[in-house]
Structure formats: structure tokens, C-alpha cells
């Protein structure tokens, strides 16, 4: 499991790639901390209601759940979350994996600049290395044979 500081740094980095303000990093991390793995869909998911938003807000030191709701909307607009029903959000596996987030032991980002810029994310789960490629589609996940060093 990644330390909380590493999770925050990772989230800040991927938000910066999509020009999402830094203030939403705490909301993304707080939401991810309360999310569970939906095995049927192969992604992390959270069901939010007023109580859950209040709890996330309280943990972040916010006075009301309003900023949490706004943050979820902003994260959805940027493609990090997908609202599948009212109050049900799925985390984009291209950024958060297709396995339980708690199993991630290490995560790396590689940014390539050129005629076509892209960003590759490598996550280490136990002995497995999984590469997530940024794509316009919500889900692009591939198993990688690359060494993680």
C-alpha cells in the first residue's frame, strides 16, 4: 500500500497533467481513501451521499460537503472519475488501475514529449507490473513485461 503522502503526490501530478487546480488533490485523495474495488467493473468505485461527503469534508477540515461535491464534478469533467448514476462514481482505471488501490506498492509516471506527447503510468502490484496508458477512452489497461527498477 502506498503511503498517504505518495498518494497525494501522485494525484497532484496527474491533476496537473489535465490542468485541474491543486485544491482538488485533497478531495481526490479523500475520495479514493473511501472507495472500494468493484470486481465486476474492474475499477475503484465510490457511492456518495450527503453523509459520505460530510465525512470526507470533515477529514479534510472543510466546513461543509459542498466543496466535495464540486470536486467530484471537476474530477469527472477532467476524466478521472465517471458518474455512472446519481452519487456513484468510478475511478478511471487508466489512472487508478484495474485492481484494488490498496494493493499498489509503487507507482511511476513517465512523460514523453514529442510530436505526440503521452504519459505512461506503471504500477507495481506484488510481483506484477501493470502499465496504464493515457487514452481518450475511459479504459486502457495493459499487462506489461517491462522491468520495474
Tell me the role of every PLM-derived stretch.
Residues 1, 125-149:
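N-terminal intrinsically disordered, low-complexity, charged/polar
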Residues 1-51:
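Short recognition helix of helix-turn-helix/winged-helix DNA-binding domains
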Residues 36-95:
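Winged helix-turn-helix DNA-binding recognition segment
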Residues 16-19, 61, 114, 126:
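Short, flexible coil/linker elements and helix-boundary hinge sites characteristic
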Residues 6, 111, 143-144:
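Intrinsic disorder/low-complexity segments enriched in polar/small residues
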Residues 9, 13, 42, 54-60, ...:
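Polar/charged alpha-helical tracts
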Residues 97-131:
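Short, amphipathic alpha-helical interaction segments positioned at domain boundaries
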Amino acid at each position: 500500500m502506498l503511503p498517504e503522502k505518495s498518494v497525494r503526490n501522485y494525484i497532484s501530478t496527474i491533476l496537473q497533467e489535465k490542468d485541474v487546480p491543486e485544491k482538488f488533490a485533497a478531495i481526490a485523495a479523500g475520495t479514493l481513501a473511501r472507495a472500494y474495488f468493484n470486481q465486476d467493473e474492474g475499477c475503484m468505485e465510490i457511492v456518495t451521499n450527503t453523509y459520505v461527503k460530510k465525512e470526507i469534508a470533515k477529514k479534510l477540515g472543510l466546513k461543509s460537503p459542498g466543496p466535495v461535491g464540486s470536486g467530484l464534478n471537476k474530477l469527472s469533467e477532467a476524466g478521472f472519475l465517471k458518474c455512472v448514476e446519481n452519487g456513484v462514481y468510478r475511478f478511471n482505471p487508466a489512472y487508478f488501475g484495474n485492481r484494488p488501490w490498496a494493493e499498489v506498492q509503487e507507482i511511476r509516471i513517465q512523460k514523453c514529449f514529442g510530436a505526440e506527447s503521452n504519459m505512461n503510468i506503471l504500477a507495481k502490484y506484488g510481483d506484477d507490473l501493470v502499465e496504464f496508458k493515457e487514452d481518450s477512452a475511459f479504459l486502457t489497461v495493459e499487462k506489461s513485461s517491462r522491468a520495474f527498477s
